Amino acid sequence: MVSGRVGGDGGVMADVTGSGDERDEDEGLRISEPKRWAAGAPGVGHALARSLTRMGTRRSVRTLRLVNQDHGFDCPGCAWPEPPPGERSAAEFCENGAKAVAEEATRARVTREFFAEHSLADLAGRTGHWLGGQGRLVEPMYRAPDADHYRPISWDAAFTLIARELAALESPDEAAFYTSGRTSNEAAFVYQLFARALGTNNLPDCSNMCHESSGTALTSTIGIGKGSVTLADLEAADLVLVVGQNPGTNHPRMLSSLEKVKRAGGRIVAVNPLPEAALLRFRNPQHARGVVGRGTALADQFLQIRLGGDLALFQALGRRLLDAEDAAPGTVVDHDFIARHTTGFDDYVRHIRGDGGPSVGGLSAAEIAAATGLTGAEIDELAGRMLSAKRVVVCWAMGLTQHAGAVATIQELVNVLLLQGNIGRPGAGVCPVRGHSNVQGDRTMGIWERPTAAFLDALGAEFGFAPPRRHGLDVVDTIRAMRDGRVRVFVGMGGNFVAATPDSAVTEAAIRSCRLTVQVSTTLNRSHAVTGRAALILPTLGRTEADVQVSGPQQVTVEDSMGMVHASRGRLAPAGAQLRSEVAIVCGLAEATFAALARRTAQAATAQAATAQAATETAATETAATAQAVAETVPAVGRTADVDWVGLGGDYARIRAHISRVVPGFDDFEKRLAEPGGFALPHPPRDSRTFPTPSGRAAFTVNTAPALTVPPGHLLLQTIRSHDQYNTTIYGLDDRYRGVRGGRRVVLVHPDDLAALGVADGTHVDLVSVWTDGSTRRAENFRAVSYPTASGCAAAYFPETNVLVPLDATARRSNTPTSKSLVIRLEPTAGRA
């Protein structure tokens, strides 16, 4: 069975992404009307049902009461911040957070008997839902080169095997070290130290596929790639724009903050191609009015924008603000802020006003309407809201970041905020809403293929070595390097690289070309089924579990989406006696690797010395000197033999001590962790209206709206999550807010578009993406569903549709896959009515 194919001019189609039991799973697919509100009693019911099924009653109560509490553990789900400790509820988690906890704290186990029963081919034919549902991984497993099954392996043997492969590489750049956003600060820090001590900056991470565009745009405009608001700022805003984001599914606890905005008199505008339930009304299950009442209407205005039209929208808003300033000088534009703190304003104004006529950034009113799908009156209404607001926050997520023009779009929304001085004052600013719980912290710890010189200088000074300076590989470039034979060893610290990445056929072939792939994981996923010639699964502790090392119980830390750092302490007994923490795994692997490199060095020196004995005394002296030089240069690999990896793995406070001397803002790290709720990292634009850009000022930028041509008979597709899903983890087969139950292979299309294409509602179709080089990619057997999405646009779930995303389809400057703007056509599925 096949769920996707890719072909080019030659017409050759390659099978990818085995569908396994997908057709069986989708046999119960049912479609109903989308919901008009989110959460409420059903949310509580679904959370409890999942928890009780996976964990049982006592375990559920014991675990859920500790989620996001000051002395508990950080939810392994999203990165939305917690309220101050005194303001937290007893149930400071959402429905999807409860699902994430249940997935990790499940009583089910994946044992050696499971792997003996299921071959790799069998596993590769299963769905992500089935794989994740098997339970927790409990012992290291090894797939010998080209073997059909995994077999048990000891930790020492696993470390030795990996170390041997790494030591045998011709260059450290033949290895790549991927990081998932669940990884703690402590694990991320030693992981990047290990990679750089080895001699490479190949540190791709999940941020490359999501908010890399945000970091790139914000660094170039305000000097720091993080959001500028706190939770208190958001809740004090007069106007909040929620753009390209579905908080009800992806960040449900954000809804409580949006409710506070409304109850304080603020206004909310939602900008999105889909009318998501949570953008319309929220029934807060923490309050009686949310359970038995109607809840709170959230969006005062809903702009159903066309995919990719956001840049044109923000330019149109900028033009309207400038025109309003002309009509009433000194009442709209914050000239004092602009003069004191910004650069590029005059160029921005010239670009937006163009020739002085009614055009905006070179676009006519008709072109703006075509790009956005909005009327001039709708844009006027939003501009009016901005004119009357004193404090504006713009929130966004993947709906902005995964387009070819994503970086320019985010720069443009910064332009609009700068016009009114809405950066660096209370209740105003930028709010990129991060996904995985510590994805922002991992970047702070140095998980980045393009580290700054300042970070490398500090790291080198702390550990006494010269870190590599050449930039490494991000996710897309790692796939290319594996495909081309330039990366031979892949190590994944959490996550599900194979399922999360674009162009499934290319990615899976690239992974299979590796000599060794290593996955550090809690549960089974597709990256354990599609592997290199040899593969290892290293099972790790989850957030919910107690981490006890030789120095005693440990705590780890995370950084939320607003730059707050706090501790996380699991309490449950580990799922298996052989589980090791991520920190212990990294430190054990580093110890074994540098020992292997030292042996290699010694062997090289011995060989040189043996050759010298057969030569003249003078030649022998020269050869011995050469051998000594070899001994000194082979571990140019960092000269980190002096790092006490064992000690770091046994006491995480020692890691935090190193972090405090390397990473700005972590002074007195250990002491400040004791503060209730943790501590905030410095953010110059927010804290003091200072901007660490080359000019020392915030930058207005000039951006051109990208032209995206959609041929007749085609649609623009965005890939989305279901409500029973977190990233690539599939908890169930329902997406109840959108009225989809019992299956995932659906494509949501506007009824007018279905009629124009001659496709009846309920028809089974293949999705065929069309790339600029003429190649096509196919995802088979999706049910077309009539749905009120923006006209000309469609939506379908990932990872099933990742096969449609060309590897070369990336955002300019950030190299993020453009999963929100794929040109597709619908073709009838063979053999299905």
Give, region by region, the residue ranges found by the protein language model.
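Cofactor-pocket helix-loop regions in the catalytic cores of large enzyme subunits
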Residues: 15-45, 135-437, 459-605, 610, ...
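Short Cys/His-rich Zn2+-coordinating modules
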Residues: 52-62
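Short, flexible, mixed-charge glycine/proline-rich loop motifs
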Residues: 63-69
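Short cysteine-rich clusters marking metal-coordination/redox-active sites
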Residues: 72-78
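Short, non-ligating residues that shape and space the ligands of small metal-coordination modules
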Residues: 84-85
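Low-complexity, highly charged intrinsically disordered N-terminal segments
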Residues: 102-149
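Low-complexity tandem-repeat tracts in intrinsically disordered regions
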Residues: 608, 613, 617-618, 622
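Long, compositionally biased stretches
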Residues: 672-813, 819-821, 826-833
